[in-house]
């Protein structure tokens, strides 16, 4: 999966939030067992897409009556899953957000590619982490996302 992601720690729920960033979502269909989801039809996005709201970093399809493309994609692909290994991952990424020494970007990419998805699918524990994968969504973001830690997962 090639995507530019924003990582933010939600300290209230002790979970890590991952979301796409940039002028527009650049999600592509995923190869392999997850398959691909075709882009959402333009009619799924209402004319009044809620740009007046103070929500930051959400694509305009987030205000669709049928829900955002990402949510539809992840629901279809069962990607709202549990986290098993490295319970300190949210704290590690939060340290990177603060500019403190932690995992390197390369280590993070390897972690996501080689560990996380397998563990989410095959194992499971109580701590929950929602991941929204923009599979084919081409809707522009309402406004620029808040500053946070970026990395590219190749």
UniProtKB/Swiss-Prot annotation:
Keywords in alphabetical order, please.
Activation of host NF-kappa-B by virus, Activator, Apoptosis, Host cytoplasm, Host G2/M cell cycle arrest by virus, Host mitochondrion, Host nucleus, Host-virus interaction, Modulation of host cell cycle by virus, Transcription, Transcription regulation
Which stretches of sequence are listed as region Mitochondrial targeting sequence? 68-117
**Which GO BP terms, alphabetically?**
DNA-templated transcription; symbiont-mediated activation of host NF-kappaB cascade; symbiont-mediated arrest of host cell cycle during G2/M transition; viral genome replication
* A Pfam short name: X
PTM section of the record: A fraction may be phosphorylated in insect cells and HepG2 cells, a human hepatoblastoma cell line. Phosphorylated in vitro by host protein kinase C or mitogen-activated protein kinase. N-acetylated in insect cells.
Subcellular compartments: Host cytoplasm; Host nucleus; Host mitochondrion
Q: Can you cite an annotated GO cellular component?
A: host cell nucleus
Family in the record: Belongs to the orthohepadnavirus protein X family.
Give the function comment from the record: Multifunctional protein that plays a role in silencing host antiviral defenses and promoting viral transcription. Does not seem to be essential for HBV infection. May be directly involved in development of cirrhosis and liver cancer (hepatocellular carcinoma). Most of cytosolic activities involve modulation of cytosolic calcium. The effect on apoptosis is controversial depending on the cell types in which the studies have been conducted. May induce apoptosis by localizing in mitochondria and causing loss of mitochondrial membrane potential.
> What does the subunit section of this Swiss-Prot or TrEMBL entry state?
May form homodimer. May interact with host CEBPA, CFLAR, CREB1, DDB1, E4F1, HBXIP, HSPD1/HSP60, NFKBIA, POLR2E and SMAD4. Interacts with host SMC5-SMC6 complex and induces its degradation. Interacts with host TRPC4AP; leading to prevent ubiquitination of TRPC4AP. Interacts with host PLSCR1; this interaction promotes ubiquitination and degradation of HBx and impairs HBx-mediated cell proliferation.
Q: What is this protein called?
A: Protein X
């Amino acid at each position: 999966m090639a995507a530019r992601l924003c990582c933010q720690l939600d300290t209230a729920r002790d979970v890590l939030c991952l979301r796409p960033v940039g002028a527009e979502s650049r999600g592509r269909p995923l190869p392999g067992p997850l398959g691909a989801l075709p882009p959402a039809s333009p009619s799924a996005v209402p004319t009044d897409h809620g740009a007046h709201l103070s929500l930051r970093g959400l694509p305009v399809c987030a205000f669709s009556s049928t829900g955002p493309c990402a949510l539809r994609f992840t629901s279809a692909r069962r990607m709202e899953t549990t986290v098993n290994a490295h319970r300190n991952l949210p704290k590690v990424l939060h340290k990177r957000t603060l500019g403190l020494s932690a995992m390197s970007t390369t280590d993070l990419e390897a972690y996501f590619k080689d560990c996380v998805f397998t563990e989410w699918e095959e194992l499971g524990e109580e701590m929950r982490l929602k991941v929204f994968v923009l599979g084919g969504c081409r809707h522009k973001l309402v406004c620029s996302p808040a500053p946070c830690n970026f990395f590219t997962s190749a």
